[in-house]
From Swiss-Prot:
Taxonomic placement: Eukaryota, Metazoa, Chordata, Craniata, Vertebrata
Similarity comment: Belongs to the G-protein coupled receptor 1 family.
InterPro entries, per database record: GPCR_Rhodpsn, GPCR_Rhodpsn_7TM, Olfact_rcpt, OR51/52/56-like
Matches recorded under PANTHER family: OLFACTORY RECEPTOR 52M1, OLFACTORY RECEPTOR 56B1-RELATED
Function: Odorant receptor.
Stated name of the protein: Olfactory receptor 52M1
A GO MF label: G protein-coupled receptor activity
Residues spanning the signal sequence: none
Protein's membrane topology: Multi-pass membrane protein
Subcellular location: Cell membrane
Domain of life: Eukaryota
Disulphide-bonded residues: 99-192
């Protein structure tokens, strides 16, 4: 294993340990991780295929759902294949540029996903609070622009992270990253220089995205609940709230693991390193696995489309 204690050097590559402390169990750990990754890929590809084929699903909410599925595929694919390579083949080596690229993809698309959830909250707000104008406000062009803005925001916010590491912190105390992927804080901790700027920027962006998006989503749902409470009958209220159930579940699936993982990473000094790494990997896998399931179970149109899989296969052929 490549370690250079007390010597600062410019690395050409890093060595990922996988799940530190559980190296003897890597082969066995590959079974649940490989299975979960397969479920995530199949689920999200199915969502993309169903929405593409069924014209009745060509609506803003389902276009946002497709964006969510594509993001989840990027997030899971940016880490799990490498993790399985470590588990199965001992492929622990990762080039410096590949490491920084992986870091960018993970943090960028997590930020983009948060932006898509905010756009979906806006869609639900317009659909419930101003339904007559929904088709005029949420046009295909507007939906595309909201997705593009979310992507650009992710690139602008996260782009400086690998650049600052590359330009400000070229020297490293060791080439061994005690993690299964190139997480920002794990890489910065290995550097020899003053990393305070990198740490402050990374934390600031994380809290900025988390707090601002959470507050905006919460505000939209406060207005939604006020509009729902103004409906005449309990049945109408339940039916209207039901249109938000999938989105609310997906929000909880996304933000709760982030909050738990961040709190444990910052303040859980007593938590063993394997738990930190396992939580970080589950955080990138749980939303891609559960989002398609939640929307398939809670959304009638998707359920009905999935029941017509044989007809869909005929169309593809």
């Amino acid at each position: 294993m490549l370690t250079f204690h007390n010597v600062c050097s410019v690395p050409s590559s890093f060595w990922l340990t996988g799940i530190p402390g559980l190296e003897s169990l890597h082969v066995w750990l590959s079974i649940p991780f490989g299975s979960m990754y397969l479920v995530a890929v199949v689920g999200n590809v199915t969502i993309l295929a169903v929405v593409k084929i069924e014209r009745s699903l060509h609506q803003p909410m389902y276009f946002f759902l497709c964006m969510l599925a594509a993001i989840d595929l990027v997030l899971s694919t940016s880490t799990i294949p490498k993790l399985l390579g470590i588990f199965w083949f001992g492929a622990c080596d990762i080039g410096l540029d590949a490491c920084l690229g992986q870091m960018f993809l993970i943090h960028c698309f997590a930020t983009v996903e948060s932006g898509i959830f905010l756009a979906m909250a806006f869609d639900r707000y317009v659909a419930i609070c101003n339904p007559l104008r929904h088709s005029m406000v949420l046009t295909y062009t507007v939906v595309g622009r909201l997705g593009l803005v979310s992507l650009l925001r992710g690139v602008l916010y996260i782009g400086p992270l690998p650049l600052m590491i590359r330009l400000r912190l070229p020297l490293y105390k060791t080439h061994v990253i005690s993690h299964s992927y190139c997480e920002h804080m794990a890489v910065v901790a290995l550097t020899c220089g003053d990393s305070r700027v990198n740490n402050v920027y990374g934390l600031s962006i994380g809290f900025l995205v988390l707090i601002l998006d959470s507050v905006a989503i919460a505000a939209s749902y406060v207005m939604i609940f006020r509009a729902v409470m103004g409906l005449a009958t309990p049945e109408a209220r339940l039916k209207t709230l039901g249109t938000c159930a999938s989105h609310l579940c997906a929000i909880l699936i996304f933000y709760v693991p982030i909050a738990v993982s961040s709190l444990i990473h910052r303040f859980g000094q007593c938590v063993p390193p394997p738990v930190h790494t396992l939580l970080a990997n589950f955080y990138l896998l749980i939303p891609p696995i559960l989002n398609p399931i939640v929307y398939a179970v809670r959304t009638k149109q998707i359920r009905e489309s999935l029941l017509q899989i044989p007809r869909i296969e005929m169309k593809i052929r």
